[in-house]
Amino acid sequence: MVDHITDRDRRYTLFMLVVVFTSSHVDRQIMGILGQPIKDSLQISDTQLGLLTGIMFAVFYATLGMPMAMWADRNNRRNLISFSVFLWSLMTALCAAATNFVQLLLMRIGVGVGEAGSNPPSHSIIADLYPPEKRSTAMAIFGTGVNWGILIGFLVGGWINEWYGWRIAFLVVGLPGILIALLVRFTVKEPPRGYSESLVPEVAPPPFWSVVRYIWSNPVLRNVVAAGTLTAFSGYAAVIWVPIYLVRIHELGTGEAGTYLALTIGAGGAIGIYLGGRLADYLGEKYGEQWLAWVVTIAGLLSIPFMFLCFFASTSGMAILAYSLPAFMGTIYVACSFALIQNHTPLEMRSVCAAINLFIMNIIGLGLGPFTIGLFSDVFASSMGVDALRYALLVTLVAIAFGSWFYYRTGVWVRRVRGLTQT
């Protein structure tokens, strides 16, 4: 740990955390563009595909995230992130050797175990580097890793699959992560805790269940966790199943589908999350912190009709065009949620609060989102045939609607809480 962080150190650390977050989402989301070829090659069902991309990955990813976050609140966060990148990258590369469902499932669980140690300490480091008035923008920049990961995963994975097959695609995206792990370990500085706010922890990090009780008793945290979880349910389900929908129903190749989605979800979504974070910081500073939540409410409600049009489009062009707006705004919630949680959490609880939020978000969002769509698709298939996937995807619209409501409630509570603290 160092005692002083320069502006250059701050920018470089954030850049490397974005690279790490990008790598995790390349390795996580590549299953979306490779889903149909893997299904055909290994002869698995949509439910099994949902298990690979959802709940089995998420259970280990989310469950191990909490003890790793508690460790990070007491020890070196940079070293934990470095080890995590190495592990998930190795397990992604090993997916290339899988010859059946069980083997691939075990490799994907390994990816989840590796990724469990990255996000909570990253959030904590960013909170130490950037003060509250700049935190939404910093979290937005960090959150663009989701979209850059999708861009690289879909673009590289889609075309490598068409040229060399899905196994080589796993090798190509997995192995570079080992270099990233080394760069984090030897070039990133561990910042002092509370550095951005000139604070030091007044007490030792509290026990886990004390943090759980704190979150439950805090209406802002309670509502933003519910809101983010429901929005993540829709987002994770869509990012896995929309590529499969385009390949299966609209008969696009994985390279073509990956290119279109890399541009819409990847590049468009990255711009959206960054601008959303900047807008949230601007509105929050000018009109009140509640706008960090209300920006997401507006984005969610605007997305619903366009997603419906996407799922029932008669051509691939219409589907991709309709999906462009939801893709642009779909990850705005990431920066705003992360910033609100850090803003309303005591210094000594930040990593664990982030981990608890991610646990719930990932078990329900990442875990049940893709799995639920796969299950419904199999259930509807006997009566609807190939169109079963269209109707299964409607579940995502319900999740967005409820998520938008909880973001609205979050903003209401933020306004009340800030009003009380100022009187």
Predicted features by range, described:
Residues M31-G32, P219-Y274, G330-V334, F338, ...:
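Extracytoplasmic gate region of multi-pass secondary transporters
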Residues L183-T187, I304-F306, C310-A313, L394-T423:
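Multi-pass alpha-helical transporter architecture, strongest
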Residues V2-T6, P192-V225, I249:
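Juxtamembrane intracellular "pre-TM" segments in multi-pass secondary transporters
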Residues Q43, N76, A97-Q103, P131, ...:
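Helix-breaking motifs and short loop linkers at transmembrane-helix boundaries and internal kinks
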Residues L34-T63:
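Extracellular/periplasmic helix-loop-helix junction of adjacent transmembrane segments
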Residues M107-W148:
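Cytoplasmic helix-loop-helix junction between adjacent transmembrane helices
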Residues F142, V146-F186, E190:
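Helix-loop-helix hairpin linking two adjacent transmembrane segments in secondary transporters
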Residues T63-V102:
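Conserved MFS/SLC helix-loop-helix module at the cytosolic interface between two early adjacent transmembrane helices
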